[in-house]
Amino acid sequence: MRRLLPVAFALLLAACAAPAVRPDAAASDVRDIDDLALVAPALAETGQRTLLVLDIDDTLLTSAGFFGSDTWYEWQKTLPAGDPGKVPCLFDVISLNYETGTQRATQPDGPALINALPNDKLLLTSRNPLSRGGTLRTLHDAGYALPTMLGGQAEGRSWDFRKAPDAKPVRVLYDQGVFMTTGQDKGLALLDLLRRANLHYPRVVLVDDGQKNIDNMRAALRAAGIDYLGLHYTRVDKTIDQADADAGRAGWQAWRQLLAGAYPQRLQALESGHCAY
């Protein structure tokens, strides 16, 4: 026993001397950008293997008009019941807009800039997987190439995501380089995807126009001990003037008129609160 004591003591000293791995030791930074040309130099700031995560709405793509835009979605939350611009079953109407509307790149050179980046890439959106068709169409029409699947995965995957063990399950989908998370915490959803794919990146760079998404990703990666750079993309103007509000109200009334004439049962379902999304 006495012979073992010096060995045990030496091991104890070595353990105390070794630096502890703490989540708060991970590098974490956030900055504003208004040009996607700034993504490439940000990726090159370290020699670490880096995963580039890109939001879609108002980051890669934006709506040509106010109705159906990301800003319109936020405006909907402020409208009182009975306002002629407030839509019933908001996410059903959003899905209709995705299927029928058009979007453009947030900046003319955006697709070329993003397509040229050699890093592992992931498009991470809050959109529902049921809106996948319209999402892929608008990305293609704008000139964006879909990223290669991470880890060389041959097929996509869909699963019930829970942000906490007792949380309600929400269906998410990762396929063709696009991760659709149905409004879930993007940081927690990304970690769940990487865990399921048995992948690890020492550094993640997120480009997103939403401050909440930037902050959620920062919190999740810090807790996981992963270095993080959040690039808050501010190019798209979020202000709403009276002309926008008028367009928002007129847009929904135009939809109502079309649905009433062509698909009255769907309009009745929407206005009765029978939401599919």
Q: Which stretches of residues belong to each language-model region?
A:
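Alpha-helical substrate-recognition element adjacent to the catalytic core
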Residues: 20-166, 174, 180, 277
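C-terminal motif of bacterial Sec signal peptides marking the signal peptidase cleavage site
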Residues: 14-15
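C-terminal cap/substrate-recognition subdomain and adjoining C-terminal extension
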Residues: 19-27, 33, 37, 51, ...
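Sec-dependent signal peptide recognition
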Residues: 2-7
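Short, linear, compositionally biased motifs with a strong N-terminal bias
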Residues: 10-11
